[in-house]
Amino acid sequence: MTSFKDVLDQLRENQPQGKYGIAFEKLMVNFFRTDPVQKSQFDEVVRWSDWRYNGGKADTGIDLVAHRIEDDSWTAIQCKFYKPSTYIAKNHLDSFFEASGRSFETENGPMHFKNRMIISTSDNWSSTAEAALENQLIPTSRIGMAEISESPINWDVAFPGSEIQINLSPRETFEPRPHQEEAIARTLEGFATHDRGKLIMACGTGKTFTALRLAERVAEANGGKARVLFLVPSISLLSQTLKEWTAQSRVDLHSFAVCSDSKVSKKAEDIATHDLSVKVSTQGADIAER
């Protein structure tokens, strides 16, 4: 099975260096259209040159633009196709921050980008570049090699000529194993006579996946709708669960993250909120609007 790293290696071998950036942008457009986490958030993703609101201006830092379904807003995206050893400094981000801070004209008048994303094939960030992602007026998140590599995607990419040919597809979802089916059935049986309960399963038996299939059964019995509150002790566990649920879900998920402590990402064992693949909020008013 071809991996994302294999695709990047093939890109470097089959494309002239001057076309690296364009080929990677096209690959990321298809990634956003196929990855279940991104696809659930955005209904349109295009390169800057193809965006109807670019005002006829050339790309000066913004490579892709995505339309967020939830709030009818636009997200500016920068794609950095670097060698894994490249060190990302703050000055690598300045032109993107400047360009995405400007307004753009639409048929409904001027608008601003409400979110930013930075995609990079290097995970080596300087402390100043890392700090630049924090406390931005326009929330800024990043997507690195690990997140893209772990995406449940079949990477079908070819180079028949001078142009990259991309045909990505989602991987198949799993069926519950016998012990998981039994856990789901017994839980539903318990809910028939009780309004709460506890499902205890051993480590490595697929608790997260079982919880997803259980939630889907509850939604099915409720006309296709259900509200799930998933409590976790860390942002990293939230990220892991969100990825697995979105990758395996057979119903549409509308997910958002709530963080009770804005400084939780400072803990060494956790990840930063800007590394989460969905919007994060600590504001009650913002959460209530959703």
Where on the chain are the PLM-derived regions?
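Structural motif
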Residues: 73-75, 115, 227
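SF2 helicase/translocase NTPase motor core
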Residues: 1-19, 39-54, 104-111, 120-290
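Catalytic centers of nucleases
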Residues: 20-111, 126
